[in-house]
Design a protein with these regions (language model features):
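Flexible, low-complexity segments enriched for small/polar residues
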Residues: 24-38, 42-46, 51-65, 84, ...
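Soluble non-cytosolic domains of exported or imported proteins
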Residues: 41-48, 57-60, 64, 68-72, ...
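Bacterial N-terminal signal peptides
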Residues: 5-16
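Active-site substrate-binding loop specific to GH73 endo-beta-N-acetylglucosaminidase modules
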Residues: 126, 131-136, 151-155, 187-424, ...
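Bacterial signal peptide processing site
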Residues: 18-20
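N-terminal accessory alpha/beta regions
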Residues: 63-177, 182-200, 227, 233-236
Length: 551
């Protein structure tokens, strides 16, 4: 009942508008009265600024993070995060060593994780092989699904443990922007290299480099079917499909404009889609099941003149036709505005403030799409530090899992990360498994429902209670010094540790009402032991509160 009541409160709060209102006196120590913003409403007080930055530029705060940021200075911390190469992250890299597929090229992955032998499967179905024999001949750690499982674990490990938190936020952001679905055919062998070679090195670089690299990568070519796209009169010359008529495929062209660059209202027409598709004919994959490398096939290419957004691309350009299209799209003001809107939505509000979008879009155009420069504009803006932006975003399941582990002060290794990645899938966000090219959404309405919130609370209960044995945590450390015989004292200490003491009066009342439950407290000794408060159960309830669901 207590989880259901809290879920109803959380659901009602998260489906409301604006940032949550906190109880009087709930601001963290060291906070000053808000100063007035030069644009918009009041700004966050200094104490809340650090928490706000840790919730937006990182996957939540760990015990001691606020003090560490205050010691180096907020601006200095942000600057370091914008330059992840200056941050020592060797501990995370050592933990990732247990995930060998992360370092493999596509040809290596295809060799090391071969396709299941259909003959073995047939023998198993006919009873000619036992399950044990099948496992010995095709061990799980060598099956193709292992590639995606290791990548999911790596993403989780990075989010929880990496000191380069902003880089991980941006890797997640750009992967969803340039999404590929790991469950589609050969993409499962390509996806790890895609994130490693396309997304990660460019996450804080130039947008143009992300567009160019994603366009040529086998994962994108396969996912959006461009590797099969050919001029309209092309006939397959050899192989099992010899003599088959191939044709133009517009999938990549459409998503390139609608989702990667211009946006759905970017001013292009169906004619532009067809012309862009013609420009990318022949951009294909060399031997997808053994090599998986980009190849340009001149015989598949439409060599005629193309007209894209009023720009003429002369006949005979070959592979360069696609490159020229990319340059046209990258330079468009519509692209600047679309990317600016998505960045502001990610870091400020589900309803991006138009003045800030305008400034970020202008920065895109003057900086040549430099991501780091655009982020600086956001992180220095009054809109970013506005009171109405504080905890105004609802966490995705992935953000919730990572932030819960971090808030409890837990540590994870690669083995624990597998378990947490599965938990993320169970509460609604299987990593690398978003089927539509939009990737996973970044708006509250996609993630808020009573069922989803109950699933989050069940995870919180399992996590805090130690049901993930490979996750090393000690909930007692969060309430050190508190009298465990006093449920109110324990609750206050947990609220301070997990949500900085900032809860609405309604949340505090709902949580306080649970303190009389025998599941939570023992007022005196009995056969279960001495009087005490169940820290894990109470911590789980705090993790399920509306305040913790927000960032």
């Amino acid at each position: 009942m207590k989880r259901f009541a809290l879920a109803l409160l959380t659901l009602g709060t998260l489906t409301g508008c604006g940032a949550p209102a906190f109880a009087a006196g709930a601001a963290p120590r060291g906070g000053a009265a808000p100063e007035e913003a030069t644009r918009g409403g009041p700004l966050l007080a200094d104490g809340r600024r650090i928490l706000h930055v840790l919730h937006r530029l990182a996957f939540g705060s760990r015990p001691g993070d606020v003090e560490r940021v205050r010691a180096v200075g907020l601006e200095a911390w942000i600057d370091r995060q914008l330059h992840p190469e200056t941050i020592d992250d060797r501990a995370t890299e050592r933990a990732l060593a247990d995930l060998p597929s992360l370092r493999m090229s596509i040809p290596e992955a295809l060799r090391q994780y071969p396709r299941p032998d259909p003959k073995l499967r047939e023998k198993a179905q006919n009873g000619q092989l036992t399950r044990r024999e099948m496992t010995e001949m095709s061990p799980p750690e060598k099956r193709p699904f292992r590639i995606v499982a290791e990548l999911q674990a790596a993403k989780t490990l990075h989010a929880v443990e990496s000191e380069r938190q902003l880089q991980e936020i941006m890797v997640d952001f750009w992967f969803n922007h340039f999404n590929v679905f790991a469950g589609k055919g050969d993409v499962r062998w390509y996806v790890s290299a895609y994130e490693r070679d396309v997304v990660r090195p460019n996450a804080l670089g130039r947008f143009a480099d992300l567009v160019r690299a994603s366009a040529r990568h086998p994962a994108m070519l396969f996912y959006l079917d461009n590797w099969l796209s050919a001029r309209r009169d092309f006939t397959v010359p050899a192989g099992p499909n010899k003599g088959r008529k191939a044709g133009l495929n517009e999938n990549y062209a459409r998503e390139l404009m609608e989702l990667h660059t211009l946006g759905v209202d970017g001013g292009y027409t169906q004619s532009d889609v067809a012309e862009v598709a013609r420009a990318f004919t022949g951009w294909s994959i060399d031997r997808p099941q053994t090599e998986g490398r980009f190849v340009f096939r001149p015989r598949m290419h439409d060599t005629g003149t193309k007209m894209v957004l009023g720009h003429s691309i002369p006949a005979g350009g070959g592979e360069d036709d696609g490159q020229r299209v990319l340059e046209v799209l990258i330079r468009q003001p519509s692209t600047a505005r679309f990317i600016a809107t998505k960045l502001v939505r990610r870091f400020v509000s589900d309803t991006p403030p138009p003045p800030l979008v305008d400034r970020v879009a202008a920065t895109y155009l003057t900086s040549g799409g430099d991501i780091r420069t655009m982020l600086r504009v956001i992180f220095a803006s009054p809109e970013f530090y506005g009171e109405d932006a504080y905890r105004a975003k609802v966490k995705t399941p992935f953000e919730f899992v990572a932030s819960a582990v971090r808030a409890l002060g837990a540590t994870v290794d690669a083995h624990a990360a597998f378990d947490l990645a599965r938990a993320t899938a169970e509460i609604g966000e299987p990593l690398y498994q978003a089927q539509p090219p939009t990737g996973y959404p970044d708006r509250a309405e996609a993630w808020v429902s009573s069922g989803a919130l109950l699933a989050r609370m069940n995870f919180a209960q399992a996590l805090a209670s130690g049901r993930y044995p490979r996750v090393a945590l000690d909930p007692g450390s969060l309430v050190a010094g508190a009298d465990l015989r006093s449920p109110d004292a324990v609750l206050d200490r947990l609220l301070g540790a997990l949500v900085a003491g900032q809860t609405s009066g309604e949340t505090r009342a709902v949580l306080a009402a649970q303190l009389t439950s025998e599941e939570i407290t023992r007022s005196g000794p009995d056969d279960r032991g001495p009087a005490k408060t169940d820290i894990a159960k109470l911590a789980a309830l705090v993790l399920g509160s509306p305040e913790f669901q927000r960032r």
